[in-house]
């Protein structure tokens, strides 16, 4: 289904061959590692700096913005991992576009939705880079724009992805396709629920400044981030035995 195909055997002209599932999931693991490192390091070594609130009420967890962009070395590692994972993410986005285009569907809107899905995915990656490289302490308004745009495009991407899978009746496909579709729906629902809950808690914190409320907000932020990463990790089921291959010009592979 994907035009990054695995040949029956690896010829002598194949220079590099990597399972595409490994490639796609490893790409997501870079920001996952950086995210967990930033949270743990902030709690251990920059607790007071990263948990301070504007109204000085007790708080026990750093927000995502404070953890990844407030202090060093967290900011350096986060930017490094996001930078390293960005180009491969665009390649995965292109692979998904070809994947969907290669899936039969009679719905007349399906081809257009495939391209919209690719655009949403690309914008999600772009605005993730924007909010990463412009921290809230450097330029709060630009960072805020990056964050809000990232959330908008990531929600749109998840919704359109689930719509595409429903259009192509993936629930009646292979076991891997059924598993992937089921997890995509669960993770999208969880992501949306946690995002809406975090907005409510954030407004609650700004209105009343009660102890521990910002801690709850930060925890909900963590769940939002982790569910987003988990959604992208469903690529493990989507690409099966496909391989990413670099071949010499004489090797006629797509």
UniProtKB/Swiss-Prot annotation:
It is a multi-pass membrane protein. Its EC number is 2.3.-.-. Residues 46-113, 166-186, 232-254 are lumenal. InterPro entries: Frag1/DRAM/Sfk1, PGAP2. One of its GO terms (biological process) is GPI anchor biosynthetic process. Involved in the fatty acid remodeling steps of GPI-anchor maturation where the unsaturated acyl chain at sn-2 of inositol phosphate is replaced by a saturated stearoyl chain. May catalyze the second step of the fatty acid remodeling, by reacylating a lyso-GPI intermediate at sn-2 of inositol phosphate by a saturated chain. The fatty acid remodeling steps is critical for the integration of GPI-APs into lipid rafts. GO terms for cellular component: endoplasmic reticulum membrane; Golgi membrane. Residues 1-24, 135-144, 208-210 are cytoplasmic. This is Acyltransferase PGAP2. The chain crosses the membrane at residues 25-45, 114-134, 145-165, 187-207, 211-231. Keywords: Golgi apparatus, GPI-anchor biosynthesis, Membrane, Transferase, Transmembrane, Transmembrane helix. It is an enzyme of class 2 (transferase). Belongs to the PGAP2 family. The keyword ATP-binding does not apply. It is found in: Golgi apparatus membrane. The keyword Cell division does not apply. The lineage of its organism: Eukaryota, Metazoa, Chordata, Craniata, Vertebrata.
